[in-house]
Amino acid sequence: MIHKFDVVVVGGGHAGCEAAAAAARAGARTALVTMRRDTIGVMSCNPAIGGIGKGQLVREVDALDGLMGRVADAAGIQFRLLNRRKGPAVRGPRTQADRKLYRQAMQAVISEQENLQVIEAEVHTLGMEHGRITHVGLSGDSQINCAAVVLTTGTFLRGLIHIGQKKIPAGRVNEPAAKGLSASMEAAGFKLGRLKTGTPPRLDGRTIEWNMLGFQKADEDPVPFSLLSEKIQNPQITCGITRTTTDTHRIIQENLDKSAMYSGQIEGIGPRYCPSIEDKIVKFGERDGHQIFLEPEGLDDHTVYPNGLSTSLPEEVQHAFLKTIPGLANAHVLQPGYAIEYDHVDPRELEPSLETRRVRGLFLAGQINGTTGYEEAAAQGVIAGINAASVASGSTTVVPSRTDAYIGVMIDDLVTRGVTEPYRMFTSRAEFRLSLRADNADERLTPRAIEWGVASKVRRDRFYKAEQELSDARELTKARGLTPNEAARHGIAVNQDGVRRSAYDLLSFADINIERLKAIWPELGSIAPKTCERLETEARYAVYLDRQVADAERVRREEGRSIPDGIDFDSVPGLSNELKYKLRQRRPRTLAEAQRIDGMTPAALALILVAIRQGEKIRGAA
């Protein structure tokens, strides 16, 4: 049987759902091909969305009218704004999610999406002619003719689960790996690498001694991810907190030779910033304990996810070390922890549109590009889906730049630097993080979504309303002001320079907020609370944004500057140990070469530039 679609998306995970929905919103007749319809939207690992850097990505996906933010709001059961006490530029919205509710909500929005059809099958082959995608071959000798394909295969490409010395070919527990597709990719000339990730054992919450634990509560005022979410409806839960002990560490040390990671059985490299418990014990042996968060997986589910205990040790060793952790002595293991290896493509094979250079019309998104995390996958999926629809219709492809979005930062990092380990997003990766905040994602990207034709009428109307309210509030505060003497009478300390300062200017002062200004100008009480928060943040950062842009420009001008052979990177203050090691190994000759080192940040590059200049001054004075 032969089907015909404009775009085919392979895989129904976080990248696949976003890619399929985005292509369909762009007007392409789209097929989402998945081995099992009931696993669309499954959270394979941790039951959480967002976090530092990751929460910004979710907001950006939502600003492009993507799905993840709305679905997380519908399924969230413990909302927390991380770094709440710090500045808005580094705050990260996060929620624990009910696995069942998340899957159900994602499947609902996929089924309701116009131009989108779900096909239950396995893709075995990619059809190409003259370097361009033409079709995909399915199980059962069917094929789908198409103009563009988006591969979002997650951990399924030749996936191999490791539990101790046991190996199980699978893409996820009890789900088969995809084997034919890897061979088809290699036949097309793609060189595949191996990466690895892991997951902890799942525990029965009814067998945990909760009275022995610390607790972490949800925020009292949960902040939704999506502009379209009015409020959070689900009850909010509490998570337990415990720690490993010296006995835990002893058992793990004694059994390292049985770990799939440390026995040499695993080829793939794992995510540095989500280490296994074996890695923690080996690399941080001086510590007497590591914190573990016990995260309930649902409102009516007894399963608990022990965040921080990812492992590939044998089941009997997992049982043994769990008994040494406070509160878990009698915990029943529902599913053992495991590591999983899978194939990936060097992302330097891609254009910034996420189309492969080798095969036109073929797009890649998610873990196949060497990233880790639901949020990173979803963000790539949106862009790949929009661009696949563009290729199918003969339109120009699009991509946010590093100055526009964390999505742009991530894609630029991937296609220019490649990966040596699974890539995850951090706020430190962005040069312009003061302007790439979670709270202004709509302002930055929804106009692009409207321009690209992927924003719904509901999204457009809500966005225009919010922007008009912010504009009105800005005008209202800029039209009211105080002289230094008037400010002093209201208890506001400013320089006695005779300059009149508007209410908007006063909001940039650390001790001034809109509530304090309402006492002076009661009419400011007409500004909605959400708008007040946006206005305060905008005013507070305005004075710093110009400086940030100037710093970035200075680094760009200096990219060709040579790095002296004798520079001691270990003596450069502020550099992380990770970067010091990579700099010693690579010995870059110029700042431009240093910039391409995986993990290099704009701030670190500026520190190296300062060290070079200081060395030049010392040599000049000698």
From Swiss-Prot:
Q: Give me the residues that bind FAD, please.
A: 11-16
Q: Name one GO molecular function term.
A: flavin adenine dinucleotide binding
Q: At which positions is NAD(+) bound?
A: 270-284
Q: Which UniProt keywords apply?
A: Cytoplasm, FAD, Flavoprotein, NAD, tRNA processing
Q: Name one GO cellular component term.
A: cytosol
Lineage: superkingdom: Bacteria
User: What subcellular compartments does it reside in?
Assistant: Cytoplasm
Q: What is its main location?
A: cytoplasm
Q: Name one GO biological process term.
A: tRNA wobble uridine modification
Subunit-level organization: Homodimer. Heterotetramer of two MnmE and two MnmG subunits.
Q: Which family does it belong to?
A: Belongs to the MnmG family.
Instruction: Give a short account of what the protein does.
Output: NAD-binding protein involved in the addition of a carboxymethylaminomethyl (cmnm) group at the wobble position (U34) of certain tRNAs, forming tRNA-cmnm(5)s(2)U34.
According to UniProt, the name of this protein is: tRNA uridine 5-carboxymethylaminomethyl modification enzyme MnmG
Gene encoding this polypeptide? Answer: mnmG
